[in-house]
Amino acid sequence: MTAEPAPPPSPETNLRYRGDLVRLAAIDPEADAEVFAAWFDDPVGTRLAGFRPVWPMNRESARERLEEWVKASPGTINFAARTVADDRLVGGIGLMDINHIDGNAQLGLSVYRQDDWGQGYGREMIVLALRYAFNELNLHRVWLTTSAFNERAMKLYEKLGFRLEGRGREHVLLDGTRWDIVYMGMLRDEFEG
């Protein structure tokens, strides 16, 4: 059971959640559905994010999924990541299983289009979300998981200060191969953002 404090300030009104490249924003299910549907149908992008869709997603089903994310449980906060330059949706990031008693939450994210990978969006999304988690939610620890084959993500997480906390052996079955899942975490005093 988690105690629910008063809601923190919205990133929409707080410039601390705007970087040089992206800003955290509220998800707009109507406006964001097309980009989200295209990402959901990209087997490479969804695989790296840990999703394995079993059906194609059209605009309407994407809108419905995004509406579910907006109405997420009290222990979840999801954001859209939009470019500062032209307000284009480039990804999504969220804090899940927020536990205010123990002071921890799980971080999950994806940069949607492969053309946007390696441009610094994911790094900045993570820094802004960690700033929100540690400064607004007053969390002590943020953790995440990734599949062991996602070496690019693990390198980024390590550069940002996440530390390896463990592995779930052969946790993921993908294309006939079993992969470990990697658990990484960061404590508030390890955050440099």
Predicted regions and their residues:
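Conserved GNAT acetyl-CoA-binding A-motif
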Residues: 135-145
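Conserved active-site tyrosine of GNAT-family acetyltransferases
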Residues: 157, 162, 184
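Conserved acetyl-CoA-binding loop-helix of GNAT-fold acetyltransferases
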Residues: 112, 118-132, 151-159
